[in-house]
Design a protein with these regions (language model features):
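A short, structured surface patch at a secondary-structure boundary
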Residues: 134-197, 236
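C-terminal terminal-structure detector
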Residues: 189-242
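A hydrophobic, helix-centered structural microdomain
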Residues: 60-124, 161, 230, 236-242
Length: 248
C-alpha cells in the first residue's frame, strides 16, 4: 500500500491498521517526515522522546569520507590526466578558455568557485542573469560542449575542488547563490540542504529523473543527509559511474 497526501490523523489510523494486519506500507513523505526520520530516540521524564536537531554525521564517518575524497581525487587526476589534456584542447578549439569558474554554495552556505570544462559560449550569460540549463536543446551549448556533457567530461575538473575540500564525491549538488535564494523563497526547507558538504554527485542525481520536481529532489537530499552511510555513498558512486558509462 502507498500513502501520499493524507492528513496526519487519517494517516496514523491507516498505519496502525496496516501494521496490525502485517501489511507493508510505503509512505511518500513530506519534508517534516524526512526531518523526523533522522531523530534520535531518548527518554525524558519517564516519557519516550525524539530529539530532532541539526544533522550531525559522526566524526568517524566524516574522517573516512574525507580520506576517500582525497585518495579518489588524487588517483583520478593522475590516471585521467591525458583525458584532461585532450578535453582542454578540444574546448579551446572555439577560441574561448578551456575552463569555466562559477560561484556555488557548499556546507553552511560557504561560497566557492566550482571548476568545469566550458561547455557553453563565452557570452552565455552576458546580461548577468543566472539561468538554469534547459538541457541538450539549450542553444548556448557549443558543439564540443554537447559531447563533453554527454560523457560527463565537463565535470572532471571538479576533482580539484574535491581535493581542495570544497566538494565531496557524494553530497547534494552545489547551487549558485542566486538559484539557492530563489529555491529558499519557494521552499524554506531548502536551507537545510546546506548542512552537508556539496558533492560531485548525490542521492537526488542518481535516484531522481529528469522530470523529478525540485521539491522531491530536496526530499531525496535531506533523506541522504539525515542518514549518513558509507555504504550508501558507495552505492551512489557506482550508480553515477554506471550512468556515465551508459551516456558514453
Amino acid at each position: 500500500m502507498f500513502i501520499s497526501g493524507v492528513h496526519s490523523h487519517e494517516r496514523n489510523i491507516i498505519l496502525k491498521y496496516c501494521v496490525g494486519q502485517g501489511i507493508n506500507v510505503f509512505v511518500i513523505p513530506r519534508v517534516g517526515d524526512v526531518i523526523m526520520s533522522g531523530s534520535q530516540p531518548m527518554h525524558m521524564f519517564h516519557l519516550p522522546v525524539l530529539r530532532v536537531g541539526r544533522y550531525m554525521a559522526s566524526p568517524e564517518y566524516l574522517f573516512v569520507k574525507r580520506l576517500m575524497d582525497i585518495v579518489v581525487s588524487l588517483v583520478g587526476l593522475v590516471i585521467l590526466s591525458p583525458l584532461f589534456l585532450i578535453t582542454a584542447i578540444a574546448v579551446k578549439s572555439d577560441g574561448g578558455p578551456a575552463f569555466y569558474k562559477q560561484v556555488r554554495l557548499t556546507k553552511d552556505g560557504k561560497p566557492f568557485e566550482i571548476l568545469k570544462f566550458r561547455s557553453m559560449r563565452v557570452d552565455a550569460e552576458k546580461d548577468g542573469v543566472a539561468r538554469l540549463s534547459t538541457g541538450d536543446k539549450d542553444d548556448r551549448i557549443t558543439k564540443v560542449g554537447h559531447v563533453i556533457r554527454a560523457c560527463r567530461l565537463d565535470e572532471l575538473p571538479q576533482l580539484l575542488n574535491i581535493l581542495k575540500g570544497d566538494l565531496s564525491i557524494v553530497g547534494p549538488r552545489p547551487e549558485r547563490p542566486e538559484i539557492a535564494a530563489q529555491y529558499c523563497e519557494e521552499m524554506p526547507e531548502f536551507a537545510l540542504r546546506l548542512q552537508a558538504k556539496a558533492g560531485l554527485t548525490g542521492y537526488a542525481q542518481v535516484y531522481g529523473k529528469y522530470n523529478t520536481t525540485p521539491y522531491d529532489k530536496l526530499q531525496m537530499d535531506l533523506m541522504y543527509i539525515a542518514h549518513p552511510s558509507l555504504i550508501e555513498d558507495l552505492k551512489i558512486c557506482l550508480l553515477y559511474t554506471s550512468d556515465a558509462a551508459d551516456d558514453k
